[in-house]
Amino acid sequence: MLDTKMLRANFQEIKAKLVHKGEDLTDFDKFEALDDRRRELIGKVEELKGKRNEVSQQVAVLKREKKDADHIIKEMREVGEEIKKLDEELRTVEAELDTILLSIPNIPHESVPVGETEDDNVEVRKWGEKPSFAYEPKPHWDIADELGILDFERAAKVTGSRFVFYKGLGARLERALYNFMLDLHVDEYNYTEVIPPYMVNRASMTGTGQLPKFEEDAFKIREEDYFLIPTAEVPITNMHRDEILSGDSLPINYAAFSACFRSEAGSAGRDTRGLIRQHQFNKVELVKFVKPEDSYEELEKLTNQAERVLQLLELPYRVMSMCTGDLGFTAAKKYDIEVWIPSQDTYREISSCSNFEAFQARRANIRFRREAKGKPEHVHTLNGSGLAVGRTVAAILENYQQEDGSVVIPKVLRPYMGNREVMKP
């Protein structure tokens, strides 16, 4: 959510920046008129309340003097009715304003490249050598089928499309990966490990920006106003909703492993096979609460920490700076880390690292004090995948595949897999 005072003072300038995000600004254009009406109503109500207090004092004087006060009492009642009517209109206007404010996307940071689609994203850096094959590299679902470690067919029978059973060494590889990721972030980067709830309430989904705009993309629990989490970012960020933190406690860094649930609305026909686009998948999420002046330095740290996972796994990747049109609703700046997928001859997203500035903190009312009696300020929040586990499994199977159908296990994972070096058919 954007700051109302900032919107009021810089309306046209902010609108020009939001145009680059390609968002529908129909509601945004209503803000000025509604905000003016709100301020006008507040002024009228305050004026009438002052008049009512004045009249009330006159009634008291007349009654003490045992004089007729009926005409003034009538006037006071009329003023009261007018206040009631204006208060009702004020509540309606404020509700409309709240709806508009919740629908306005975050403002892109000045360093974000201007563009309309993913084709306008800018490559920041590359790391690693792409593997070369003397044969046509197989897709990970075929490799997994030969190894007997993933079962999409039975998962479709049990649940539906875009689900999977991990079996045997597949399950162990998945577990090895998220344990390795958590150990790295907790031990090397001093994150606090958290296991969050997998269901959250409406206020939590609103706080991080999934609601109201993206409700159709969420899995909702029937008969309850609960949602399955699309990412651990939602419960972890909302841990500190409606709190005032001590400035000395910042930055706060959390690393959380969780299942994530996505409806993938709008993705029909895309990535219908394999692990790239599932309704349920595991992810290690990194969430930061920081002082505003530190947030862009922390974004670089966060991105480097997510990259470190791929470096230790020796998987080639690139880092992309998202353009304004591909930035999403909540981020002020975002990097996507994309891992090399040989069978597709392209890089695919495996992590997004975002700085939301105060956008989420304002929605979730998360503040801090620099000093014990200082004025509360909104924190800046950041989050990034460290990493999406299923996509990492896919990348390992494809980049480490051998012509005989076996897959070499990355060296860093071997202690987590009983010191095995290879998975064989």
From Swiss-Prot:
Entry domain remark: Consists of two distinct domains, a catalytic core and a N-terminal extension that is involved in tRNA binding.
Oligomer and partners: Homodimer. The tRNA molecule binds across the dimer.
This protein's encoding gene: serS
GO term, biological process aspect, one: seryl-tRNA aminoacylation
Keywords attached to this entry: Aminoacyl-tRNA synthetase, ATP-binding, Cytoplasm, Ligase, Nucleotide-binding, Protein biosynthesis
Entry similarity comment: Belongs to the class-II aminoacyl-tRNA synthetase family. Type-1 seryl-tRNA synthetase subfamily.
Catalysed transformations (reactions): tRNA(Ser) + L-serine + ATP = L-seryl-tRNA(Ser) + AMP + diphosphate + H(+); tRNA(Sec) + L-serine + ATP = L-seryl-tRNA(Sec) + AMP + diphosphate + H(+)
Subcellular location: Cytoplasm
Known role: Catalyzes the attachment of serine to tRNA(Ser). Is also able to aminoacylate tRNA(Sec) with serine, to form the misacylated tRNA L-seryl-tRNA(Sec), which will be further converted into selenocysteinyl-tRNA(Sec).
Signal peptide feature range: none
Pathway, per record: Aminoacyl-tRNA biosynthesis; selenocysteinyl-tRNA(Sec) biosynthesis; L-seryl-tRNA(Sec) from L-serine and tRNA(Sec): step 1/1
Protein name as annotated: Serine--tRNA ligase
Predominant location category: cytoplasm
